[in-house]
Design a protein with these regions (language model features):
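Bacterial Sec-dependent N-terminal signal peptides
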Residues: 1-38
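Conserved SGNH/GDSL esterase-like catalytic core that processes O-acyl groups on lipids
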Residues: 100-212, 218, 222-323, 406
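Active-site segments of SGNH/GDSL-like serine hydrolases
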Residues: 303-309, 330-365, 380
């Protein structure tokens, strides 16, 4: 059936390419776009359809077709493994407020983990955003006791030892606690918790020590890692994680929590999402433990979704934006030069709800340059939306929010669908080329 579809597609493309057809250039371009949309809808099977979406642009762009080879090799090994092997593929998706809410990344995580080819290796990186007095993802609850203060990389007045999340919570009370409880969300039950990593600067002698509050007989092992985390493996799956503190020396005065990773011992996809409201590329360069925690996460794919806040001011330094991304790419490759890197362009926005933002197109152009110059992949969501002023159309059909910056929950779900389909399509092409039957 797929072979027949491909033949039909090529036939239609050939017909549209015949110069003798009496179409003017504009008509031909429009008909080609409509054909591309139809082809993609046919190949993607069932998906939500919206007239405002440029489905023909929904593809992974690469100068070098090998840009995602490392990730696809790992994905294929996971897909074809024996059950007892329990391999995991790790994805780190970093960004700003679009990522902190986890609507977009949550949908992608769900699609990967519910795909029978891959499986569920856990919720991944989490943070007690509620303790930091900011919005928490909806698939887990945060509870805490004691007084906690937040330190954010986006605040110039804040100074802290940040990791990949770019946000910390701190306390001076050794009796303070934090609990993370995954919950059912959108009819999806939470992943089981068989292993947890608590990230904090363990080499800082002035910090209290982190401990897991759980029955001793449910803890199989505990180990402190020099990469800056306490790893606890459970003998019984947990439904929530409670973190306590232990003051073991008079020199200890406070505690800094950088994040918590919730994992299983099964094979599957571990999709970490880290983002903070207002984040720009330059802010991630303030994170002292960024590379250290990258080494501990060992991502096979790093997705970078930044640019909305860089491009928001009227005076946008697109050269600095590109330079900061180069530094982030270099940090990733310092840890593993083979790690696949996928950039995503920011969505179209307005400033103050009424001024169309020309800078987003500049950001998209710099990302195109990076794709060509740094052998990274690009998912051009700006083009998929429809480009300049497209957020207006997205808002009209319920896909964008009134602020003309963020998408609605429906919009983020659609974005997740599109992103996953683009990756999956490129993965299938890779299999056809490198693992032919």
């Amino acid at each position: 059936m797929m072979k027949i579809k491909k033949r039909v597609i090529w036939f239609l493309i050939i017909i549209l390419s015949i110069p003798t057809l009496a179409f003017c250039q504009d008509d031909l371009q429009e008909k080609t776009k409509n054909l591309e949309d139809s082809i993609r809808l046919m190949l993607y099977k069932e998906r939500p359809y919206f007239e405002v979406v440029n489905y023909g642009a929904n593809r992974i762009q690469m100068k070098d077709s090998s840009s995602l080879d490392y990730f696809f090799e790992k994905l294929y090994a996971l897909q074809t493994q024996k059950k007892e092997e329990k391999k995991q593929v790790k994805i780190l998706h970093m960004g700003d407020s679009h990522i902190q809410a986890d609507f977009f990344t949550g949908k992608v995580r769900r699609l990967f983990q519910e795909d029978k080819r891959f499986g569920d290796a856990g919720r991944g990186f989490t943070f007690p955003y509620s303790a930091a007095k900011t919005n928490n993802p909806f698939d887990y609850k945060t509870r805490y006791t004691g007084s906690w203060t937040s330190q954010k990389m986006v605040s110039n007045k804040d100074q802290s030892q940040w990791g990949i999340s770019g946000i910390n919570v701190e306390t001076t009370n050794p009796k303070s606690t934090i609990t993370l409880e995954p919950i059912e969300y959108n009819e999806r039950k939470p992943s089981k918790i068989e292993k947890v990593r608590i990230y904090y600067p363990i080499l800082n002698e002035e910090l209290f020590e982190a401990v897991i509050i759980a029955p001793t007989n449910e803890i199989k092992s505990q180990k402190m890692h020099l990469d800056g985390y306490l790893e606890v493996i459970f003998s019984v799956p947990q439904t929530s994680i409670s973190i306590g503190l232990d003051k073991t020396d008079d020199i200890q005065t406070h505690f800094i929590l950088q994040g918590v990773s919730l994992e299983t011992n099964d094979g599957g996809i571990l999709y970490h999402a880290v983002g903070i409201n207002g984040a720009e590329t330059r802010h991630y360069l303030r994170c002292e433990d960024f590379e250290t925690q990258l080494r501990s996460v060992q991502p096979d794919l790093v997705v970078i979704s930044l640019g909305t806040n860089d491009a928001y001011p009227s005076r946008f330094d697109d050269t600095a934006f590109k330079g900061n991304l180069i530094k982030i790419i270099e940090q990733v490759r310092n840890i593993n030069p083979n790690t696949s890197i996928l950039l995503t362009s920011p969505n179209d926005t307005y400033r103050y709800k009424k001024y169309a933002n020309y800078n987003t197109q500049k950001a998209e152009e710099r990302l195109q340059e990076l794709m060509r110059e740094k052998s990274v992949a690009l998912w051009n969501f700006y083009q998929i939306m429809g480009g300049f002023k497209s957020i207006i159309d997205w808002h009209k059909v319920g896909l964008g929010q009134y602020d003309k910056i963020h998408l609605s929950q429906t919009g983020y779900n659609l974005q997740g669908d599109l992103f996953y389909e683009a990756i999956n399509e490129q993965y299938q092409k890779w299999i056809d080329k490198n693992r032919p039957k």
